[in-house]
């Protein structure tokens, strides 16, 4: 017991003091306070146990150190930094560290101060919301987070001082009881997942690591609830709740596009890539690469937009932990980690963007829907710009993003292709050169003008973005803004080949996709009105228009009343569909039962023949015969003429001749070669029947026209009965050889010698349909390139590019042509395509300062 003692008077008055005769009561009080969660008391007890200031009779010395470590771990979890330092010292010395607590000590020491503070805030939050229960509901947590977020927005908007902010915070209830279970709807109970303290502590750890807490999947913080419009009929959701409708549509579209790689299995993706590698030719490869890179760009952009929406949720979590934590909460560091952890879609985007720019000049314009691509890229440009303008927590948009976008538009806009700007808006004519241009090297031009000045101002703006927040603005502002500028470049490139009607068509198509349900609902409402008015047979046009407007207004009002009524809103959609389909059938049925005459709307378009080609760039037959054919034929020593004529290889020619012989010179089948050389027999037989067809089915003939048709069929029937083999001949790639006699017999008679020479035309697989219909004696006009001209060959060889029938027996023969780049080898052609793509990429990045021609 404590008693008062008084010292003897010595002339100086001293303080009275307590004499604690029983210190066990004080130790019990300390233990009780420490068990209640006081970090300072836990630290003091641990320090006294380590210093042997407290001797507990029931514990040995080793167990006493172990208990001190347990107190230090508890104090460290509660945010006591001195306890962390002492715990680290104990771990290094091995004092109190056992096999049971070593893992827990390591995890505690591995945590950052911010993570420990966040975990402490999570425990306090759960204790506040649970009121002693073992769990809380997502609705409680969501309501608390929304309340704190709205309060922080009001504080930022009003810019109040701390005292007023704290007074406002005191008005908010800190703790709230659990919901009354009987009042909760059964459907909500089934879909709701209860949250325990372990869930919140795990969420705090994920938050500190810059990862979205898994608990966030059960919450709807920055987006409306997906079921918020389920009580409204489908056709009336945009009419009654337009903002929620478009918001839900936006987020559902993002989720759909983002989930595409997860929906398509990996085996299917690999099979598609293998098929593309097999079937893609040199001209198909750029087309496939373009659309593949464009799809990756769209997917990566949607993934970025999804990350931006998640970042808003992450900031709400920051506000939650800041409101319940202390000064050790590292909200800025956690947010920067979250942005860095989600940089992978940006890498995919820029790689696909570079590939898209490289292959764009290699793709034929006929294979690209420029107007649709312009609308899509333009929409993504403005969406990404609007999202990046509000990357910070400020209410006003980021002025630097707007200025940078405007400067890029002024610098990259194709003024020379816009008639309105070039003829009327002379004050925007930035193409006037103010400095002289300089030619640097082969095909590189350095020029300075007003657009160049704007272009040089762009890096300054980008550096200003990157310098924000101690260079954290690189991934907060700069990289998202570069995505906007990339889509702007795609929009400008595709808009140069688009048309006004094409852009209108694409815009209406995009609007139709977004507004399909509302438009269909309006049509379903108005079709019965049109049928009813049409059945009345009103003669007066004014009466007809007035009755139509009145009936439409009544129908719309009546349908809205039925949609708002709870008793009828479940059946209004089905009733509307049935009525619309019935009335549409009544309108269409008379026209379907009538007979129509199909008249051609368009005449056959005339085709330009080979006669329209210029002969200035080609080698005429008379000159070739005089230089090569005649000397090689007449001179006994042909070496000199052969060497000279070999220099003509690659020169284009346009000649006319008579067909003498047509045959197949070469057959290639990549699939058959792979199966025959690299696969076992049983697997090869299976793949031949899977990808090919039966020989008897492949062989087709007409007994009336072919006398040996029946004999061939019997042979194949017997062969199939014995082996059951299949063929892959439909995968064959043929090269044809046409022997054509070129020359003029009339001039030969006058000169006393013949000027005709046999020329071999080597035709590509694409000429198969044309060559099969040729007959001996047909006169053709062909365009091609000389190949191995009179060198190591008996006849002149020409690689066929275009052939036109002049006098042929078959009436189906016209003109056949292939478009191929003249190059020394396929590898040279691919290198030329690659150089064109790289020049286009460099022009997109450096033009107009440096131009690669």
Swiss-Prot record:
Q: Which residues cross the membrane?
A: 238-258, 259-279, 285-305, 347-367, 373-393, 446-466, 473-493, 513-533, 545-565, 572-592
Instruction: Please give the InterPro entries that the UniProt record associates with this protein.
Output: TPR-like_helical_dom_sf, Wolframin_Cys-rich, Wolframin_EF-hand, Wolframin_fam, Wolframin_OB_fold, Wolframin_Sel1-like_rpt
Q: Where along the chain is composition biased (Acidic residues)?
A: 169-179
User: What does the record say about the knockout?
Assistant: RNAi-mediated knockdown in neurons results in age-dependent behavioral deficits and neurodegeneration, which is further enhanced when the knockdown is in both neurons and glial cells; the defects include age-dependent locomotor deficits, increased susceptibility to oxidative stress and glutamate excitotoxicity, increased age-dependent appearance of vacuoles in the central neuropil and optic lobes of the fly brain, and shortened lifespan.
Identify the stretch(es) annotated as Disordered.
139-179
Choose one Gene Ontology CC annotation of this protein and give it.
endoplasmic reticulum membrane
Q: Which Pfam families match?
A: WC-rich (PF20053), WCOB (PF19913), WEF-hand (PF19914), WSLR (PF20023)
- Lineage: superkingdom: Eukaryota
Question: What topology does the record note for this protein and the membrane?
Answer: Multi-pass membrane protein
Annotated GO biological process: adult locomotory behavior; calcium ion homeostasis; endoplasmic reticulum unfolded protein response; negative regulation of gene expression
Main location group: membrane
Q: Which residues are glycosylated?
A: 694, 769
User: Which subcellular locations apply to this protein?
Assistant: Membrane; Endoplasmic reticulum; Mitochondrion
List the expressing tissues: Detected in adult brain.
Q: Which UniProt keywords apply?
A: Endoplasmic reticulum, Glycoprotein, Membrane, Mitochondrion, Transmembrane, Transmembrane helix
Annotated function: Participates in the regulation of cellular Ca(2+) homeostasis, at least partly, by modulating the filling state of the endoplasmic reticulum Ca(2+) store. In neurons and glial cells, has a role in maintaining neuronal function and integrity during aging.
Q: What is this protein called?
A: Wolframin
The organism is: Drosophila melanogaster (Fruit fly)
The UniProt gene name for this protein comes to wfs1
